[in-house]
Amino acid sequence: MAAKFFDIEEQHPTQRFSDLVGEHCRMLMPIEGYEKKPLVTLEEAVEPIVEYVPDVRRRVYFAKTKCAELSPGELSIDEAASITLYSMEWQPQDKCLYHVLNKTLRNENRQKLTPWFLFLKLILTALGHLPSMARTVYRGVKKDIRHEYPEGRTLVWWGFSSCTSKLSVLQNELFLGRTGPRTFFTIECDSGKDIRKYSCYQAEDEILLPAARQFKVVACLSQGNDFYMIQLKEIQPLFPLIELVPQPSPSPAMHIVPKPPIQPAGRNIQKLIDIG
């Protein structure tokens, strides 16, 4: 039987999709050290962060149970479940794994990332097994933040960023909506990962940008009625902002789950608003 994940219509408004305000966009020291850690199970990977994410052990159980129901594919259960765990939300919101992780990735004190190294190794290994997508994706926030994105600025989003290629998702009142101050981002990316197969919110067809992506502001436009559009283009830094994970060859005996199908670049996908 195919795994049944949560559906967005059954959910309350999600803060992860509007977590954009936390991105200060400044240049920090690169993210390094995690790539030297061993690849371990998800249970082992979260042990060092239990004090920061108190409910994480229980959430790992749910994530791995869901991923175990998927048919064999290209990710191990632990790799797939690391993505599922990242997409989960619960109360209190500031204790969700995605929230604490992204907040730590944006912190100038890189030593605070040390407890996260095992999890970063696992989820970035998983994302490394998925093909990168060169396409335009979208995200937005119910706030006027255009002054932080002047035309020509080069910036970095240090956290993982959830995006969508389906504009109708952002128009939903749970996300960007149609009224009030709104900042809408169109992002020409080349590192997007289609994670909808592994997300708790499959109906939204999420495209996830990995941590430490650099962008240039191509344009910043006012569309009237407190609606602002910012065009970003992903660019490659002179030196890596995050050390890459060496990609091991999967074991023939490894239980792996399927890679999600990729839609053509001209078609819509779907999702979020977590810019930061």
Model-based region annotation:
Residues 123, 141-142, 167, 174, ...:
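Residues that form ligand- and interface-recognition hot spots within folded domains
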Residues 3, 36, 63, 94, ...:
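Generic cytosolic/nucleocytoplasmic N-terminal low-complexity/intrinsically disordered segments
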Residues 134, 181-183, 203, 211, ...:
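A generic structural signal for well-ordered coil/turn residues at beta-strand boundaries
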Residues 10, 27, 35, 45, ...:
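Compositionally biased, intrinsically disordered/low-complexity regions enriched for serine, proline
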Residues 43-198:
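Internal glycine-rich, Lys/Arg-flanked active-site/core loops of soluble domains
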Residues 2-33, 199, 207-276:
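Cys-His-centered catalytic/binding microenvironment captured across papain-like cysteine peptidases
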Residues 1-73:
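Intrinsically disordered, low-complexity, charge-biased terminal/linker regions in eukaryotic proteins
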